[in-house]
Amino acid sequence: MNLIGPSHLQATDEFALSENLFGVLTEHAAGPLGQNLDLESYSPYNNVQFPQVQPQISSSSYYSNLGFYPQQPEDWYSPGLYELRRMPTESVYQGETEVSEMPVTKKPRMAASSAGRIKGDELCVVCGDRASGYHYNALTCEGCKGFFRRSITKNAVYKCKNGGNCVMDMYMRRKCQDCRLRKCREMGMLAECLLTEIQCKSKRLRKNVKQHADQTVNEDSEGRDLRQVTSTTKLCREKTELTVDQQTLLDYIMDSYSKQRMPQEITNKILKEEFSAEENFLILTEMATSHVQILVEFTKRLPGFQTLDHEDQIALLKGSAVEAMFLRSAEIFNKKLPAGHADLLEERIRKSGISDEYITPMFSFYKSVGELKMTQEEYALLTAIVILSPDRQYIKDREAVEKLQEPLLDVLQKLCKIYQPENPQHFACLLGRLTELRTFNHHHAEMLMSWRVNDHKFTPLLCEIWDVQ
């Protein structure tokens, strides 16, 4: 669940909503890229027409008996808001983008996540060999770690000759891959803990930057003039600029993103007034519902999204919902809260009944994002990149999704060079935050499980996008 604040879109003829609800960012972004835009001047988007959402499905409200925040229209809670419709093919963004210096492979490739090292004589929960650490959410040896990574990366399919009844040990692990992989999953190893292709690029970028930095230091030690390095940096900054098509793409993304504003009355309510744990939970549920609505509308407006297979659209939206909401919450936490209110908000959320084991890493993530001093353009692009991740489950045409994501990565990489030329690792750091975001999918699933046990209620929209029965 997104635990910071709701985000709402301005009402349109196609998407009628309560006047006091929609839009997310209260202030305009600084600089020329954040100014109000006249999209009529951008030819690739002149003819874009966004389809109407299907008629809303009426449902009984969970909140009709509560008076501590305004009651919203019944259709606000409806799963009908989640329905995505196709857009005519001719309205697809056709702008050509400059080829990025960062290579992008045709198919997503995964890599191992960093594992926590351990001490002592702990044994691998899969085969009984000596464990080397926690790999992909389970205590395993290096052998089972590598086997699981290779199996998931290659989408391997094994078949047991003994009907799937092999007892896994250090001997049998080499004889039956089917039972070994099954045991890995039973012991809690998670495919989603493998790094995505984007995060692999981030690791490579970090490594390359470090090697370049070491080389620069060596040259300086041999008597190179430091002023030459400064001159080179300035020259690089002068040459780095967006192409016309990239600027058009960025303007379009920012226009969709900047239509969002954070309703101050709801945030102020949770900051200024103390409620019971149950009331806090209901407020947070309403905030999450609002975030999902904004996510749906922003996603529908991503260039090329509605040309994808309809099932792929659903898979992308459901797969990215948690990560996109936490990223949006990080922006609100770091840029939109009144001064000195961050600690107060954390205190109030801890009183909502949610376990500290989920809240602590969440706020640690918010603070780590704040340290990067991200611009609004970077938040918008990173959100779009998260949504258009080709390695989500159930995606049928991954290459088509990747083609939509690549131009966004190119623009983000250039913006990092423009805004922070003195920090060549900034782009890699932004992508590295996606690794942290992936862990929230697992935490969120555990939270939902605990809430179902406690019989907490969700709006139909949240039930649909979170697959809550």
Curated annotation (Swiss-Prot):
GO terms for cellular component: euchromatin; nucleus; receptor complex; RNA polymerase II transcription regulator complex. One of its GO terms (biological process) is cell-cell junction assembly. The keyword Ubl conjugation applies. 3beta,7beta-dihydroxy-5beta-cholan-24-oate binds at R328, Y366. Residues 121-196 bind DNA. Acetylated by EP300. Lys-210 as is the major acetylation site for EP300; the dynamicly regulated acetylation inhibits heterodimerization with RXRA and transactivation activity. Deacetylated by SIRT1. Methylation may increase transactivation of target genes. SUPFAM superfamilies: Glucocorticoid receptor-like (DNA-binding domain), Nuclear receptor ligand-binding domain. There is a cross-link at K119, K272 (Glycyl lysine isopeptide (Lys-Gly) (interchain with G-Cter in SUMO1)). Its main location: nucleus. It is found in: Nucleus. A zinc finger (NR C4-type) spans 124-144, 160-184. The modification Phosphothreonine is found at T439. The modification Phosphoserine is found at S132, S151. This is Bile acid receptor.
